[in-house]
């Protein structure tokens, strides 16, 4: 087999491939064995028609397409390996010659991974991050942990407040008519969660158990159900029950419940301070790395094929669907609640997808320029870290992955990021940046 690559405009080119006649004839033989099983000719049992009779009746040309289907995958794969190109999408195949006793010739129009023109990536000025834990941050973490131990208590007196969970019945109307999906009974809604149409939850604040109210809202213009988009609606709402979070006080018993290694409040706070301090140091370094990556990527130039962006969007949609499922929802329910559809969500994600692709291309280009490689020792360390993190044996991880190539690529990228930060110049943040950080 021979293959040649001719670069065309943009990120496309033509891969011209020739497969020897011997392989073509072998593929035609395989095609006959497959096709003859489906052929009915009077006087012969199904699958027992002689080759000569078949070709007299249908012609050898009837086998060509199946022969091409047999030959193409292997020939295309070998051609990619021989020419060293990196396709990012399915090729467009044009068969130029397929005939018994002759070579198969085909052209594959291929979109390939683009070349990256690197800009400045060494000696980047990076803002140094504050890694010191404050008392306020420690207290916030304590309050957050106590919140997980909070019990939901029925509010006998008083009205709905932000953070309360209300049990409601509601019945929605548009132009005086009920609409599909606009009714529910005994529905639990946390006020401030943003789960309902904008303006709905806010109008329940101040109501008491047993109260009824007409809640008037307007569906978003981009609402997934076109018949409701932009329409004014009225929901007849009844408050069945109000619950609030009863947060416990921190004492020695609670401290031990939150941290089994702590016998009292002081030990709990000290252990928590150590853990949070380490986390903040790691987070600070990650922010610095992120800035280094962003600057290196922004300084690079690359023409990204639409196919690469679409492939990344597919991955992002899968990731999003998994996160939604973990929260107990599915995409269909999410779209109903959010007022979006899939095409709108993909469009919303498109810039991030393009940024992801550019980042990956840029970091790999830097790895090539700096001859950064992942050694077997690097890969083994990463697998051990994954084993510890996910509590899975290294062997099981290898079986699941099927290959360590993904791990190798990840390690290589991590080494590039470390290189960017090691070469960077850490500078103290400006006063404006410090004030902005304090405001957060």
UniProtKB/Swiss-Prot annotation:
Chemical reaction(s) catalysed: [protein]-peptidylproline (omega=180) = [protein]-peptidylproline (omega=0)
InterPro entries to which the protein is assigned, alphabetical: PPIase_dom_sf, PPIase_FKBP_dom, Trig_fac, Trigger_fac_C, Trigger_fac_C_sf, Trigger_fac_ribosome-bd_bac, Trigger_fac_ribosome-bd_sf, Trigger_fact/SurA_dom_sf
EC number per UniProt: 5.2.1.8
Cellular component terms (Gene Ontology): cytoplasm
One annotated GO biological process: chaperone-mediated protein folding
Source domain of life: Bacteria
Gene3D superfamilies, alphabetized: 3.10.50.40, Trigger factor ribosome-binding domain, Trigger factor, C-terminal domain
Keyword tags: Cell cycle, Cell division, Chaperone, Cytoplasm, Isomerase, Rotamase
Subcellular location(s) per record: Cytoplasm
Residue stretches making up the PPIase FKBP-type domain: 163-248
Chief place where the protein resides: cytoplasm
Keyword Isomerase set for record: yes
Record GO terms (molecular function): peptidyl-prolyl cis-trans isomerase activity; protein folding chaperone; ribosome binding
Record function comment: Involved in protein export. Acts as a chaperone by maintaining the newly synthesized protein in an open conformation. Functions as a peptidyl-prolyl cis-trans isomerase.
UniProt record similarity statement: Belongs to the FKBP-type PPIase family. Tig subfamily.
Comment on protein domains: Consists of 3 domains; the N-terminus binds the ribosome, the middle domain has PPIase activity, while the C-terminus has intrinsic chaperone activity on its own.
Official protein name in the record: Trigger factor
Annotated organism of origin: Staphylococcus carnosus (strain TM300)
Gene (name only): tig
């Amino acid at each position: 087999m021979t293959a040649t690559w001719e670069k065309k405009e943009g990120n496309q080119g033509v891969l011209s491939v020739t497969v020897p006649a011997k392989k073509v004839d072998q593929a035609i033989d395989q095609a006959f064995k497959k096709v003859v099983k489906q052929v009915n000719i009077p006087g012969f049992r199904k699958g027992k028609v002689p080759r000569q009779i078949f070709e007299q009746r249908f012609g050898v040309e009837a086998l060509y397409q199946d022969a091409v289907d047999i030959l193409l995958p292997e020939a295309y794969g070998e051609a990619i390996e021989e020419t060293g190109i990196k396709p990012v999408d399915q090729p467009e195949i044009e068969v130029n010659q397929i005939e018994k006793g002759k070579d198969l010739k085909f052209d594959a129009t291929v979109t390939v991974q683009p070349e990256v023109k690197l800009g400045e990536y060494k000696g980047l000025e990076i803002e140094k991050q504050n890694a010191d834990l404050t008392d306020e941050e420690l207290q916030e973490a304590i309050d957050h942990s106590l919140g997980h131990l909070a019990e939901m208590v029925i509010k006998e007196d008083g009205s709905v407040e932000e953070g309360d969970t209300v049990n409601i019945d509601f019945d929605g109307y548009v132009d005086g008519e009920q609409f599909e999906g606009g009714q529910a009974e005994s529905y639990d809604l946390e006020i401030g969660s943003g789960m309902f149409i904008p303006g709905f939850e806010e109008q329940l604040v101040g109501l008491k158990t047993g109260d009824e109210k007409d809640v008037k809202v307007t569906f978003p213009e981009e609402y997934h159900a076109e018949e409701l988009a932009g329409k004014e609606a009225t929901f007849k709402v009844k408050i069945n029950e109000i619950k609030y979070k009863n947060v416990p006080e921190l004492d020695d018993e609670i401290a031990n419940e939150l941290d089994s290694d702590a016998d009292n409040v002081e030990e709990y706070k000290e252990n928590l301070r150590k853990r949070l301090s380490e986390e903040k140091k790691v987070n600070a370094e990650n922010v610095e790395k992120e800035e280094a990556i962003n600057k290196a990527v922004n300084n690079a130039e690359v023409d990204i094929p639409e196919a690469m962006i679409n492939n990344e969007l597919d991955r992002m949609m899968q990731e999003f669907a998994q996160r939604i499922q973990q929260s107990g929802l599915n995409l269909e329910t999410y779209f109903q609640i959010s007022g979006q559809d899939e095409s709108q969500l993909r469009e919303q994600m498109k810039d991030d997808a393009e940024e992801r692709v550019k980042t990956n291309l840029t970091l790999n280009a830097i790895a090539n320029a700096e001859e950064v490689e992942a050694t077997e020792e690097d890969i083994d360390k990463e697998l051990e870290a994954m084993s510890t993190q996910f509590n899975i044996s290294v062997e099981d991880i290898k079986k699941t992955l099927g290959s360590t190539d993904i791990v190798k690529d990840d390690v290589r990228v991590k080494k590039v990021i470390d290189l960017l930060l090691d070469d960077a110049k850490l500078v103290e943040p400006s006063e404006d940046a410090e004030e902005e950080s304090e405001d957060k």
